[in-house]
Regions:
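Glycine-rich phosphate-binding loops that contact phosphosugars or nucleotide phosphates
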Residues: 1-114, 118-127
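Internal, active-site/partner-interface "lid" segment
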Residues: 127-160
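Generic alpha-helical secondary structure signal
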Residues: 36, 61, 129-136, 172
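Acidic, Ser/Thr-rich low-complexity intrinsically disordered segments
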Residues: 154-170, 190
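Short linear proline/tyrosine/threonine-rich motifs used for host-factor recruitment
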Residues: 183-185
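Ala/Thr-enriched low-complexity intrinsically disordered regions
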Residues: 166, 176-179
Length: 192
């Protein structure tokens, strides 16, 4: 599953890829600063693949060319765009429409983010066992590596709360423990 969203659509593509990675093993978020770089990342796309292209006015020509390339390679093309008349739909077999008529110099991502969120939730419901297994595994990893739990700053007293206290080592204890090993622990070790 390839996902492409360029310029103001990049955060949408990133959000979609983040959650798709929890559900699927084969997600590739396309990063690009040039058209050729985009095609290099897609060189192996084929009939068993899908690409999701996200683009809104003013439509990205690089996204459109990526969808054309995928279509020419017989990949399934899905678009998330603002209208059935969007040029992004030229190569698409499935169009997810997120109309946003907001007249502003700032692109509103509310409507497309809602469509993406609904897509993620629908797929999670379809793949409940796989997603539950992945989330259980991630919870264990997050707990082990203290990703979320009790590692916030307490803004009242500016102290860091950690579930596991920092371990301080005495330099002599480390030297004694590793005297016969060829392990370099360097000056970055927390020692007193």
């Amino acid at each position: 599953i390839y996902i492409v969203g360029i310029r103001s659509c990049a955060p949408l593509a990133s959000f979609l890829a983040f959650y798709f990675n929890l559900m699927f093993d084969n997600v590739r978020l396309l990063h690009t600063s040039s058209s050729s770089e985009l095609f290099e990342q897609m060189v192996r796309i084929g009939k068993d693949d899908a690409i999701i292209g996200i683009s809104f006015p003013r439509y990205s020509m690089r996204t459109l060319k990526a969808l054309e390339f995928a279509n020419n390679r017989n990949a399934k093309v899905i678009t998330i765009t603002d209208s059935v008349h969007s040029p992004m739909n030229l190569y698409s077999s499935c169009n997810l429409i997120a109309d946003s008529d907001m007249a502003s110099i700032v692109d509103s991502l509310v409507a497309p983010l809602s469509v993406i969120n609904a897509l993620i939730v629908a797929l999670c419901m379809k793949k409940q066992k796989e997603v539950a297994g992945t989330l259980t595994m991630l919870e264990d990893i997050w707990d082990e590596y203290q990703v979320y739990e009790n590692d916030e700053i307490n803004y009242i007293d500016d102290s860091i709360k950690m579930r596991y206290p920092a371990i301080r080592y005495n330099r002599k204890d480390i030297d004694a423990k590793y005297a016969n090993n060829k392990i370099y622990y360097g000056e970055d070790a927390i020692c007193s």
